[in-house]
Regions:
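Class I SAM-dependent methyltransferase Rossmann-like catalytic core
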Residues: 70-96
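Conserved glycine-rich SAM-binding loop
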Residues: 119
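A conserved beta-strand element that flanks and buttresses the S-adenosyl-L-methionine
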Residues: 183
Length: 346
C-alpha cells in the first residue's frame, strides 16, 4: 500500500537532492548529499521536529550512487527510503550482537551462507562484514528488491554472492547444495501459517550437519504491544476477528484490510515453540543455542536501542519490563532472536 501522497526530487546543483514528503505519519524533507556522484549523508527534517541524520545503506562498505538513491526511491517510495536508512545501522549492530552471543561460528570461517528473504540487503551486508571469508546466496521472492541490491553491490562483493529470485517458497528448487548457515531476518512473521510449516522444513533439510538456522527480528506473539503493524496494546491477546477490527481502526490500515493480508504484514508474529514445531517435521536433531556470555545488554535493550519512534506506550512497556528484569531477572523482549543448531541426522 503506497503511503506517500506526493514526492518531488529536486537537484540542487550536482550535490544535493531533496525529497518532499507528505505522509500520514511522516512529513518534511528527506535530503541526500552527494560528493563526486556518491552518497555522503542523508537527513530527514520533519515539519515539527529537529533534523535527524541517518547512516545510509551499506555505509563503510559499498558506495551508494545517485542512481542507487533514485532506484530506491522510485522503485518503492520515499517513506520506504526513510525506513531503509533507519534500519541499516541497527541491523548491523543487531547482527553483531546476536551472532556474537548465540551463533557460535568463527568469523574467519570459509562458510556457505544463505540469507533467505534478503530484500534490499541490510542483513546480507551485515553478514558480508561479519564473515569476510564466506560465500553467500541471497534469495528473495521480490525481484525489484534484488534489483536494488544488485545496484549497491561493489565488485569486491559480487564475486562472493549469488542472488536468486525464489519462484515457489514451498519447493526452493533454485537453491542447490547445503549451507553452513541459513539466516532469516525479519522474514518469518510475514509467512502465512501454511507457508511456515512448509518453508522451515525445506530450509532445515538444506542445512549441513552442525549448521545454524538463525531467525531474527521477528515479533514475539505474546508481547503486550503489537509492535510490528498496528502499535496497539493488548491486540495480541484478542481473537482474530476482534484483532482485525482493531487493526482496521489503527490508522495504519483501512476498512478493506483482510485477515490474510494482516497476517502477511506480520500482525501475529511468532514464538520459538512454533518455529521448533515447524522444523521438527524435517530430518535432524534440533538444539536451540543459548548464550553463556555475561553482558549488561540483553534483548530488551536491543529492542529499545533499535526503536526509531519511542511512543508513550512503548516507553511505558520498556519501563515496566525493565523493572520486571530488575526484580526477577526475567528478560522479556518484543522480538524473537533465536539460533538453532542441526546436531545430527536422524
Amino acid at each position: 500500500m503506497a503511503l506517500v501522497q506526493s514526492l518531488e526530487m529536486e537537484p540542487h546543483g550536482a550535490t544535493t537532492w531533496t525529497v518532499a514528503l507528505q505522509h500520514r505519519r511522516l512529513s518534511g524533507q528527506l535530503t541526500f548529499e552527494f560528493s563526486n556522484g556518491l552518497l555522503r549523508s542523508a537527513r530527514h527534517r520533519p515539519l515539527d521536529g529537529a533534523e535527524r541524520a541517518y547512516d545510509y545503506p551499506f555505509s563503510g562498505r559499498s558506495p551508494v550512487t545517485e542512481a542507487n538513491v533514485r532506484l530506491l526511491v522510485t522503485q518503492h517510495s520515499a517513506d520506504f527510503a526513510i525506513s531503509e536508512l533507519e534500519r541499516n545501522q541497527y541491523v548491523r549492530f543487531r547482527t553483531d550482537f546476536v551472532f556474537d552471543r548465540l551463533v557460535g561460528m568463527a568469523r574467519d570461517g570459509h562458510y556457505r551462507i544463505l540469507d533467505f528473504g534478503c530484500g534490499t540487503g541490510h542483513s546480507l551486508d551485515a553478514l558480508l562484514g561479519y564473515f569476510p571469508n564466506a560465500r553467500f546466496v541471497g534469495a528473495d521472492i521480490a525481484g525489484r528488491d534484488l534489483d536494488v541490491l544488485r545496484s549497491y553491490l561493489p565488485e569486491v562483493d559480487r564475486s562472493r554472492i549469488d542472488l536468486v529470485q525464489i519462484q515457489d517458497s514451498a519447493k526452493l528448487d533454485q537453491l542447490d547444495g547445503s549451507f553452513d548457515l541459513i539466516n532469516l531476518n525479519a522474514v518469518f512473521e510475514h509467512l502465512l501459517p501454511a507457508e511456515r510449516r512448509s518453508l522451515l522444513p525445506e530450509l532445515w533439510r538444506r542445512l549441513a550437519n552442525n549448521g545454524r538456522l538463525v531467525l531474527t527480528e521477528t515479533p514475539w506473539r505474546w508481547f503486550p504491544i503489537e509492535t510490528h503493524t498496528t502499535s496497539r496494546p493488548l491486540i495480541n491477546y484478542l481473537p482474530d476477528r476482534l484483532a482485525l477490527a482493531v487493526a482496521r481502526r489503527s490508522g495504519h490500515y483501512g476498512p478493506d484490510l483482510t485477515w490474510t493480508l494482516a497476517l502477511r504484514h506480520g500482525i501475529r508474529g511468532a514464538t520459538v515453540a512454533e518455529m521448533i514445531a515447524c522444523i521438527d517435521a524435517a530430518a535432524g536433531t534440533i538444539r536451540q543455542l543459548t548464550s553463556d556470555q555475561p553482558d549488561s545488554r540483553d534483548l530488551l535493550e536491543l529492542w529499545w536501542w533499535g526503536e526509531s519512534r519511542h511512543t508513550r506506550q512503548k516507553a511505558l512497556a520498556y519501563q515496566g519490563l525493565s523493572w520486571l528484569r530488575r526484580l526477577t531477572g526475567l528478560v522479556v523482549s518484543p522480538w524473537v532472536n533465536v539460533a538453532f543448531c542441526k546436531t545430527s541426522e536422524a
